[in-house]
Amino acid sequence: MLARPSRLTRRPDYVACYNTGRRYFSKHFIVFALEREGAAPVWRYGLAVSRKVGDAVRRNRTKRVLREFFRLYQDDMPGGMDLVVVPKRRLDPRRVTLDLAVQELLPLMREIRDSLCREANDGTP
């Protein structure tokens, strides 16, 4: 598990990501990304796995796989960002693997990092 400073822990942090963050979509996940102004270049992540995904066993498996993804690929994450990952309803928790998370989330993380670089260079969103 990543250190506490790397995780979103308060409801206002999640709400800010949902309301003002940009959305990125893959087949099975939605990622809300919010750039923190004037923040240290540390990224934070949060998981929002609802009961629509399945019972407690399936939700916990999904969260374990996503936490492992963030632990393994923490060097590839964009700095100064808050990220909230939400599995879509059609995701079958029995099929969630680390390979699926890498296949879908790693390109999204690169897209987020690239869009940040573009915005920093252009000055436009």
Swiss-Prot record:
Tell me the NCBIfam families matching this sequence.
rnpA
Q: Which gene encodes it?
A: rnpA
Q: Does the keyword Chaperone apply?
A: no
Q: Reaction catalysed by this chain?
A: Endonucleolytic cleavage of RNA, removing 5'-extranucleotides from tRNA precursor
Q: Which GO terms describe its biological process?
A: tRNA 5'-leader removal
Q: Which InterPro entries match?
A: Ribosomal_Su5_D2-typ_SF, Ribsml_uS5_D2-typ_fold_subgr, RNase_P
Q: Which family does the similarity line name?
A: Belongs to the RnpA family.
Can you list the GO cellular component terms from the UniProt entry?
Answer: ribonuclease P complex
Organism, scientific name: Oleidesulfovibrio alaskensis (strain ATCC BAA-1058 / DSM 17464 / G20)
**Annotated GO MF terms:** 3'-tRNA processing endoribonuclease activity; ribonuclease P activity; tRNA binding
Quaternary structure (record): Consists of a catalytic RNA component (M1 or rnpB) and a protein subunit.
Kindly give the HAMAP family that the UniProt entry links to this protein: RNase_P
Which Pfam families does this UniProt record tie to the protein? Ribonuclease_P (PF00825)
Described function: RNaseP catalyzes the removal of the 5'-leader sequence from pre-tRNA to produce the mature 5'-terminus. It can also cleave other RNA substrates such as 4.5S RNA. The protein component plays an auxiliary but essential role in vivo by binding to the 5'-leader sequence and broadening the substrate specificity of the ribozyme.
Record-listed E.C. numbers:
3.1.26.5
Name the UniProt record assigns to this protein: Ribonuclease P protein component
Keyword tRNA processing present in the record's keywords: the answer is yes
Keywords, A to Z, come to:
Endonuclease, Hydrolase, Nuclease, RNA-binding, tRNA processing
Q: Where does the signal peptide begin and end?
A: none
